[in-house]
Amino acid sequence: MVFSMPMFYDWIPRCIRPWLYIVLAFCFQFSNGMYLGAMNQVVGQWAVMREDVQMCLYATLTGMALYFVVLFRMKFRFTNQKLLMSSALIIFLCQWLATLRLPLPLLWGLCVVCGMAKIQGTFECMSNIQLWMTPKRDFGVFFPLLHIILLVSIEYSGFLAAWFAYEMHWEYMHYFVMLLMLLVLLVQAALTRPFHAMPKIVPLRGIDWLGGVIWMALFL
């Protein structure tokens, strides 16, 4: 297959299109429901236990794991632009709500939703540049490159969260990610057009949503 990114307008240089999606993938990977780098400040300000904040991380991972099984169904149903913009908007709202003093069960549910949007945005970015990274679809090449993005984002998001918490306030990390999501929305609104990966839209019928809710309750 020949690599192309038809979701971009024709005036966007082809050489920078995949790099833009790598930047967007980093933006999504920097997001989290709560940031453990600022755990001490959150525990002190909210008067909660460390385990309560750690549970936010587990809830985010639960959302990512549960939503992973429907990523391709979503890709075959909605346009690339719609998936990325909706993911960015959901993460933006989750980041803002996470700075409020919500009841812990509600905060954990918010982190689940944030995790779903995080993996949706990352998957949509990386799946569109897979042929650029490895024209033969060699997963021995693709996954190491993907893991570079994931591991760098994990390390630097934790570092940034700790730096913001020490120098300013822990909420600034959430504001920073909100700015990143605005960047994603701006790129998608200004540089791309609706593009569907499939010649025919595949409906969402047949997905066991109730089973997903039960598994989520079991994991949490």
How should each PLM-predicted stretch be described?
Residues 94, 105-114:
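Paired small-residue
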Residues 12-71, 121-122, 126:
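Extracytoplasmic
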